[in-house]
């Protein structure tokens, strides 16, 4: 409680309704152009959330656990949570999985924007808590941070919170989601001259692809959904990152990722989803590599949105009204069973799950 009172006082911005409307309109126009600037989304949520937050407050006020949360105002910040201790917990606990998610995607609970425009302490806390619990949602529903996974989580949050900004995100997300995505996965390391003019894009055993075709047969940008854990070549990474920044909003472009240090242990050579014609897995048993390709936008509309809606409806209690802090040292599967949380189905895991 004491920590949030200090945070509230230092972050409150006192402006009139006309100024709020101006900020809302400006942020909405800029969100589509620069979706990576999450503070814009936060400001728009602040200004548009009053009625939804009031309903959340009334729900929590009439719920025993909710009343405790409103009274104590716990926060997922270092003053309240010993994050390093969470990494020492058993691997299937909620706290360990939470830290694993944050470190995998280079995130931190402190990155979540504090509510700025509510004059009411409780309302400000509720919206701030909703943002902090967002990453817990990723963990318990097993969703990564791709555009389509974020959009699916927004469906769950819309069901649980009725926040207008979640509906806006759901409507815009398909336009921002790439039409096609693939991943080339290397066995040991990315070739040092990859993405340079002298790189041989035709098949070459030295580069350990699974794909026997020329990479030049694809028109693509290496953007949006990349994951590089071992960056031996800093020039490669900076070039990859620049591609990401330049093309983040190019929804019609084909996007891909390069991963290495991966070993495909599946026994199947080819898996093809005939009903949806969505994706295909090609594996080379000798080299143990994988080429994975699918259509994110189609997948979002046909599979992720329907699953997310049902997952949101079936969950017996909104995440923001659960005392998450008391569950961090508990088994994540027990948490899911307790609140009837349905994580991402297995067949969607490679496309949208935490890997």
Swiss-Prot record:
Source organism (scientific name): Plasmodium knowlesi (strain H)
UniProt-annotated location(s): Mitochondrion inner membrane
PANTHER family given in the database record: UBIQUINONE BIOSYNTHESIS PROTEIN (PTHR12922), UBIQUINONE BIOSYNTHESIS PROTEIN COQ4 HOMOLOG, MITOCHONDRIAL (PTHR12922:SF7)
Catalysed transformations (reactions): a 4-hydroxy-3-methoxy-5-(all-trans-polyprenyl)benzoate + H(+) = a 2-methoxy-6-(all-trans-polyprenyl)phenol + CO2
Bilayer topology annotation: Peripheral membrane protein
Subunit description: Component of a multi-subunit COQ enzyme complex.
EC number: 4.1.1.130
Enzyme class, UniProt record, top EC level: lyase
Pathways involved: Cofactor biosynthesis; ubiquinone biosynthesis
Entry similarity comment: Belongs to the COQ4 family.
Gene Ontology cellular component terms for the protein in this record: extrinsic component of mitochondrial inner membrane
Top-level lineage group: Eukaryota
Protein's name according to its UniProt entry: Ubiquinone biosynthesis protein COQ4 homolog, mitochondrial
One GO term of the biological process aspect: ubiquinone biosynthetic process
Biological role stated in the UniProt entry: Lyase that catalyzes the C1-decarboxylation of 4-hydroxy-3-methoxy-5-(all-trans-polyprenyl)benzoic acid into 2-methoxy-6-(all-trans-polyprenyl)phenol during ubiquinone biosynthesis.
Misc. remarks from the entry: This protein may be expected to contain an N-terminal transit peptide but none has been predicted.
């Amino acid at each position: 409680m004491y920590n949030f009172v200090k945070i509230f006082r230092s972050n409150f911005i006192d402006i009139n309704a006309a100024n709020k409307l101006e900020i809302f309109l400006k942020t909405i126009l800029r969100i589509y152009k620069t979706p990576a600037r999450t503070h814009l989304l936060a400001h728009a949520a602040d200004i548009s959330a009053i009625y939804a937050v009031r309903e959340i407050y009334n729900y929590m006020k009439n719920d025993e656990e909710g009343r405790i949360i409103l009274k104590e105002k716990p926060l997922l910040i270092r003053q309240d949570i010993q994050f390093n201790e969470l990494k020492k917990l058993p691997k299937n606990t909620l706290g360990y999985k939470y830290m694993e998610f944050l470190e995998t995607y280079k995130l931190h609970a402190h990155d979540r924007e504090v509510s700025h425009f509510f004059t009411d302490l409780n309302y400000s806390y509720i919206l701030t808590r909703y943002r902090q619990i967002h990453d817990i949602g990723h963990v318990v529903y097993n969703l990564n941070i791709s555009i389509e996974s974020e959009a699916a989580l927004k469906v769950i949050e819309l069901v649980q919170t009725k926040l207008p900004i979640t509906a806006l995100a759901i409507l815009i997300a398909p336009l921002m989601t790439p039409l096609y995505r693939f991943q080339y996965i290397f066995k040991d390391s990315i070739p040092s001259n990859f993405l340079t003019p002298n790189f041989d894009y035709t098949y070459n055993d030295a580069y350990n692809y699974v794909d026997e075709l020329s990479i030049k047969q694809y028109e693509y940008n290496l953007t949006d959904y990349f994951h590089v854990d071992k960056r031996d070549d800093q020039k490669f990474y900076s070039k990859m990152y620049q591609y990401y920044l330049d093309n983040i909003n190019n929804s019609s472009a084909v996007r891909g990722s390069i991963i290495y240090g991966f070993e495909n242990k599946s026994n199947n050579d080819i898996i093809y989803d005939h009903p949806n014609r969505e994706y295909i897995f090609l594996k080379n048993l000798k080299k143990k590599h994988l080429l994975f390709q699918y259509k994110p936008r189609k997948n979002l509309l046909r599979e992720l949105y329907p699953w997310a809606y049902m997952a949101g409806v079936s969950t017996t209690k909104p995440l923001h009204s659960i005392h998450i802090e008391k569950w961090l040292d508990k088994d994540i599967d027990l948490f899911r069973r307790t609140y009837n949380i349905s994580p991402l189905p297995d067949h969607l895991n490679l496309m949208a799950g935490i890997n």
